[in-house]
């Protein structure tokens, strides 16, 4: 997409200051781009994950109350009728995809835990599994109205499964936390500490935003930073995961919202006044929220597109700020970043070019002006004349 197409789509003209560009540069601070390479070995062993995996992998969809109910309805329906066909299709679909509320929720839970174990480390995975299990057991109690969209039989079925999974609370021993952190987490912590020292050497207070793609990973990573021996007494960590537009809505994974102890507004307010100096966030903090400029923006996960790249980087607007992207050793992800950087440079060069051809826009403006020339308004008391082309609608 070239500049002219963008201008046409937005019905606008892209302009860049020329006369006062050097003065503007004194107040607009582009962050220094950095990258972190980390080696990702095979995931370490997580006790709670192994226990969860052993149960979820042997679940039989035929035991699910939703499937049992559909089979009961199918027996009562008259074969060959539209109702019979509808129930049969619904039953076949849920058995094939294993996507009943309970089974899909547990599969989502398992995948989230596996991703956290690989990305953040076994300690974070063990903590996440235990916390979600505790919340889920409470929510699955038929006497609680937490899973309001679930039927009591589904809650009882889920509770039976959860009670068969043996999980343990995590150890907060410093050695256990350190040893059970991933190489990626260790690289992040090293980066945060270096950035803080560099910022404070200029007598500036340090603040950072870490962008993470998945909501569950945000929660787990923030918890690790709160308790890791190298960060727990150095950083005051908060997290943002957005509001209710969730891919897990009405499933077991929606329980993770109960792990949020502070409101989004409180977290942002604390970040503004310095009560918190590190925020772990989903893309919710890329735009639209009133978050102050910070010293350091770190992409734990690569941005999915150029818009996300530009918006997250735009949070690093302080003088001497940095924008850091994390890459796995040997990956081809650097090529995407290089492509976005080159595209951005080309766009800046185009809209800053004083010799750029704007005749197509000027011709359109002239056509509009010609159409409006015969529209005028005269003020009787003063004799002044106003033309439509000069009025702001």
Model regions and ranges:
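Conserved helicase ATPase core of P-loop NTP-dependent helicases/translocases
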Residues: 207-211, 217-223, 234-282
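Helicase motor interdomain insertion/brace
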Residues: 6-229
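Structural signal for hydrophobic/aromatic residues that build the beta-strand cores
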Residues: 1, 188, 208-210, 221, ...
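Conserved segment of the helicase C-terminal RecA-like domain
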Residues: 311-343
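Short, acidic/turn-prone active-site loops that include or flank metal/cofactor-
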Residues: 242, 302-307, 328-329
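Conserved RecA-like helicase motor core of SF1/SF2 enzymes
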Residues: 277, 283-319
């Amino acid at each position: 997409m070239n500049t002219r197409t963008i201008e046409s789509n937005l019905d606008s003209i892209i302009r860049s200051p020329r006369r006062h560009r050097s003065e503007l540069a004194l107040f607009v601070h582009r962050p220094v781009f950095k990258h972190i390479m980390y080696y990702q070995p095979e995931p370490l062993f997580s006790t709670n994950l192994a226990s969860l995996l052993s149960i979820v992998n042997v679940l039989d969809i035929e035991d699910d109350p939703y499937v049992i109910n559909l089979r009961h309805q199918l027996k009562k329906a008259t074969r060959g009728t539209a109702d019979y066909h509808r129930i049969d299709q619904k039953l076949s679909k849920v058995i094939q995809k294993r996507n009943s509320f309970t089974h899909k929720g547990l599969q989502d839970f398992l995948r989230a835990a596996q991703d956290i174990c690989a990305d953040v480390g076994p300690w974070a995975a063990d903590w996440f599994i235990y916390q979600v299990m505790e919340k889920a057991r409470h929510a699955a109690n038929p006497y609680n109205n937490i899973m309001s969209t679930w039927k009591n039989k589904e809650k009882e079925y889920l509770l039976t499964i959860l009670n068969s999974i043996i999980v343990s609370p995590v150890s907060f021993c410093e050695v256990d936390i350190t040893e059970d952190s991933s190489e990626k987490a260790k690289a992040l912590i090293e980066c945060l500490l270096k950035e803080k020292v560099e910022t404070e050497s200029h007598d500036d207070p340090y603040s950072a935003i870490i962008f993470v793609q998945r909501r569950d990973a945000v929660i787990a990573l923030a918890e690790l930073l709160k308790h890791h021996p190298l960060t727990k007494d150095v950083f005051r960590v908060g997290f943002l995961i957005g509001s209710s537009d969730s891919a897990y809505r009405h499933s077991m994974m929606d329980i993770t919202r109960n792990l949020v102890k502070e409101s989004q507004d409180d977290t942002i307010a604390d970040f503004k006044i310095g009560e918190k100096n590190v925020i772990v966030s989903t893309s919710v903090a890329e735009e639209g929220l009133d978050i102050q400029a910070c010293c350091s923006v770190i992409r734990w996960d690569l941005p999915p597109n150029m818009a996300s790249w530009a918006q997250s980087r735009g949070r690093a607007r302080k003088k001497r700020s940095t924008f850091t992207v994390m890459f796995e050793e040997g990956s081809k992800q650097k090529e995407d970043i290089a492509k976005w950087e080159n595209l951005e440079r080309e766009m800046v060069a185009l809209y800053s070019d004083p010799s750029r051809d704007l005749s197509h826009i000027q011709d359109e403006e002239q056509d509009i002006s010609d159409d409006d020339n015969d529209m005028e308004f005269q003020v009787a008391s003063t004799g002044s004349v106003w033309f439509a082309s000069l009025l702001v609608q």
